[in-house]
Amino acid sequence: SGSKTAEIGDGCFGVPIDHIGSTSGMGCGRPRPKPTPGGS
């Protein structure tokens, strides 16, 4: 779950601006990346 923290900084989810996108993944503008090891 370590990679999850990196994704938050990406502006995908975890940010107040992407409150809705955090669930639908639309706030990213692209398919939300999966927390894969070595992905950071």
Swiss-Prot record:
Cellular localization per UniProt: Secreted
Single GO biological process annotation from the record: vasodilation
GO molecular function, one term: toxin activity
Keywords linked to the UniProt accession: Disulfide bond, Hypotensive agent, Metalloenzyme inhibitor, Metalloprotease inhibitor, Protease inhibitor, Secreted, Toxin, Vasoactive, Vasodilator
Propeptide section residues: 1-8
Disulfide cross-links: C12-C28
A matching Pfam family: ANP
Expressed in which tissues: Expressed by the venom gland.
Start and end residues of each stretch annotated as Disordered: 1-40
One GO cellular component term noted in the UniProt record for this chain: extracellular region
Extra remark beyond the main annotation: Negative results: recombinant PaNP-c does not demonstrate any stimulation of cGMP production via the natriuretic peptide receptor-A (NPR1) and does not inhibit platelet aggregation.
Function: Exhibits hypotensive and vasodepressor activities. Recombinant PaNP-c inhibits the angiotensin converting enzyme (ACE).
Family: Belongs to the natriuretic peptide family.
UniProt-recorded name of the protein: Natriuretic peptide PaNP-c
Species, as recorded: Pseudechis australis (Mulga snake)
